[in-house]
Amino acid sequence: MAKGMDIEIAPLDEDHVRAKITWSEQDVGGGKLVVEVTVKNPKTRPKADDQLRSDARALAVRFARAFADTIEN
């Protein structure tokens, strides 16, 4: 299993997109975490794909850190 993060963004309607974030680790036991998040993308100030990916990446990192903290405790 390759280590890294993949983000797929798909439109849901004119105001929302779905970000599917797949986080993979390559270590002893390895693992994969998949999170799907619906994000509001206002028509008045829509975000470019790069901005959406950046937001999704930041969210994935926060989620992974919180998840790791629960495992350690």
Predicted regions located by residue number:
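Short, charged/polar N-terminal "headpieces" of proteins
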Residues: 1-26
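Acidic, low-complexity intrinsically disordered segments
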Residues: 2-6, 31-73
